[in-house]
C-alpha cells in the first residue's frame, strides 16, 4: 500500500460516488475522510482481480500505478537482502575472516570516537556555545517541527479542511432533496396532502360556524354570553365532527385496505392504496347522497341521530371535497401501478 494515498486529494463526495459506482456494501458515508480512504483501499486490495481501470474505472489508474511502484520497490529490497545473504553463505572461512576484520574495525572506531568528540568540543568556540544556550532559553526561537525535513513544519500541515465541511453540507442537502422527492412521488404522500387539506377545510368551517352573530340586539348579546360560558358544549361541537371525519374518512378506509392487503399477503406495502381510495370514495358518495336526501329521518333513534348530525356537519363543511380527492387518488393509483 502506498505511504501517501492517491485518494488524499479527493473530496468526500467523490469518494462516496466511487463507492456507489463500485457497489461497495457497508461503505461509511458519514465517517471521516481517512476512514473512507482506508475502507476503500482495503476493498480494492482484497478484490480477486483488479478492476478495469482503462475503460470502466479510469479514476483508479493512479491508484494501481502507485501500487505497482510500491511492489517493485519491495521486490528490489527483497532481492538486495537475498543477494547479501547468498554471498555471505558462500564460504565458512571467508565469513570468519570478514567477521574478525569487522570486529577489529569496530573496536578501532570506538577508540577513536571519544577523541574526536573531545577535539571538536575543545575546538568549538565559546561564542557558538553561548548562542546555542541562548537559543534554548529564548522562547521566540522555539521550533515545533517534528519532521527531519526542515522545509515542512507543523504549521504547514495544520488546516481546517473547510472544503470537507462544505462538501458534507452539499452532500447532505442533495441527499435530503432526493429523499423529499422520493417521498412526494408516492401515493401515500398524495393521500396525506389531501387529508391535510380536508382537515384544514373542516376546522375552518367549524370555527366559522361557531362564531357568535354580529347582531346588536340585547337578546342576541345574552345568547352569545350564555354560549361563551358553556365551554363544554363548545368543545363537543368542535371535537365531535373532527372525530367523525377521522373515523369515516381515515379510520374505516385504512382498516379495510389493511385487511385486504393482509389477505393478499403482500409484504411490500402495508396498506393497499387502491382499496383505501376506493373505500373512501364509496363512503364519501354515500354520505353526500344521504345528507342531501330530505326524506330520511333518524329522530326516532337517538344514537343514530347524533351520529347522523355529525356526519351532516362534516358534509356541510367539506361538500364534495373528499369525493373529488378520493377520485383523483384512484386515478393516480391506476396511473402509477
Swiss-Prot record:
Q: Does the keyword Transmembrane apply?
A: yes
Instruction: Could you list this entry's UniProt keywords, alphabetically sorted.
Output: Membrane, Nucleus, Phosphoprotein, Transmembrane, Transmembrane helix
Origin superkingdom: Eukaryota
Tell me the residues on which Phosphoserine occurs.
66, 72, 99, 116
Ranges where the record places region Disordered: 66-95, 107-132
**Membrane topology of the entry:** Multi-pass membrane protein
| Ranges per topology, Perinuclear space | 261-313
Q: In the UniProt entry for this protein, what further remark is given in the free-text comments?
A: Present with 1300 molecules/cell in log phase SD medium.
Protein's recorded name: Glutathione transferase 3
Q: Which organism is it from?
A: Saccharomyces cerevisiae (strain ATCC 204508 / S288c)
Upper taxonomic classification of the species? Eukaryota, Fungi, Dikarya, Ascomycota, Saccharomycotina
Amino acid at each position: 500500500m502506498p505511504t501517501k494515498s492517491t485518494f488524499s486529494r479527493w473530496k468526500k463526495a467523490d469518494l462516496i460516488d466511487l463507492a456507489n459506482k463500485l457497489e461497495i456494501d457497508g461503505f461509511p458515508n458519514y465517517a471521516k475522510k481517512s476512514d473512507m480512504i482506508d475502507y476503500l483501499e482495503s476493498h480494492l486490495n482484497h478484490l480477486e482481480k483488479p478492476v478495469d481501470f482503462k475503460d470502466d474505472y479510469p479514476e483508479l489508474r493512479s491508484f494501481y500505478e502507485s501500487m505497482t511502484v510500491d511492489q517493485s520497490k519491495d521486490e528490489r529490497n527483497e532481492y538486495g537482502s537475498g543477494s547479501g545473504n547468498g554471498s555471505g553463505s558462500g564460504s565458512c572461512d571467508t565469513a570468519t575472516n570478514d567477521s574478525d576484520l569487522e570486529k577489529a574495525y569496530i573496536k578501532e572506531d570506538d577508540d577513536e570516537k571519544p577523541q574526536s568528540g573531545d577535539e571538536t568540543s575543545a575546538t568549538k568556540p565559546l561564542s557558538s556555545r553561548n548562542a546555542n544556550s541562548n537559543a534554548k532559553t529564548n522562547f521566540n526561537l522555539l521550533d515545533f517541527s517534528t519532521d527531519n525535513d526542515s522545509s515542512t513544519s507543523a504549521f504547514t500541515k495544520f488546516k481546517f479542511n473547510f472544503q470537507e465541511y462544505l462538501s458534507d453540507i452539499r452532500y447532505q442537502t442533495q441527499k435530503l432533496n432526493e429523499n423529499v422527492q422520493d417521498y412526494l412521488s408516492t401515493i401515500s404522500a398524495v393521500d396525506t396532502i389531501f387529508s391535510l387539506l380536508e382537515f384544514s377545510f373542516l376546522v375552518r368551517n367549524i370555527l366559522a360556524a361557531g362564531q357568535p352573530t354580529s347582531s346588536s340586539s340585547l337578546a342576541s348579546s345574552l345568547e352569545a354570553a350564555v354560549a361563551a360560558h358553556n365551554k363544554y358544549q363548545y368543545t363537543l361541537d368542535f371535537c365531535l365532527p373532527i372525530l367523525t371525519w377521522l373515523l369515516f374518512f381515515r379510520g374505516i378506509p385504512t382498516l379495510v385496505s389493511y385487511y385486504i392487503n393482509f389477505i393478499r399477503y403482500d409484504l411490500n406495502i402495508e396498506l393497499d392504496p387502491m382499496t383505501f381510495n376506493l373505500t373512501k370514495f364509496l363512503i364519501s358518495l354515500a354520505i353526500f347522497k344521504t345528507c342531501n336526501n330530505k326524506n330520511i329521518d333518524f329522530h326516532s333513534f337517538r344514537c343514530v341521530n347524533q351520529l347522523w348530525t355529525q356526519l351532516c356537519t362534516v358534509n356541510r363543511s367539506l361538500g364534495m371535497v373528499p369525493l373529488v380527492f378520493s377520485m383523483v387518488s384512484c386515478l393516480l393509483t391506476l396511473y402509477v401501478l
